[in-house]
Amino acid sequence: ALKKSPEMEPGILFTERQFGLLELHSSDLSMIEDTGNAILHGIGAKAEDQLAPKILFHDIIENISDQHSIILNRSRDASILTPGVSLLIYEMQPALFACVAANEAEKVAPNAIVNDIQMMGASGRIFMSGSTEDMQKAKDAITQILSNVKGRPS
């Protein structure tokens, strides 16, 4: 795919037995779509062959304490969780749908802070913080977008 579109920029190549990931970047959306179609053609698949997302868990924790924020921030380099905000935790399968979900959540809650996106492996997680109202909007947007993705049942 990259031979046909050398101006595409590779972002991530993560290999795993069952759930690998190839991330490509371009400012031209049609080039992204054409490259995606070339990859699917190359492996003899179509978009509908993907696994449909499955929602595993979601919750909004209101008014995070300082102790909780310290524990959750231990492995963070940026976008730290601050005491007093609400925290949205959303888990789904396959993991890569966490990227789609986070993108939709940011559209409806632009003031929210994306604290972490775990997008590799079998299950993915999003940790977002902000006002309770924004976290509810984000949760609803994620649920809607994941429910509308076509794919085969897992």
Question: Where are the predicted features?
Answer:
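Positively charged, small/polar-rich N-terminal and surface patches that mediate targeting and assembly
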Residues: 2-20, 25-104, 108, 117-122, ...
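Short, glycine/polar-rich helix-capping loops at beta-to-alpha or helix-loop-helix junctions
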Residues: 113-115
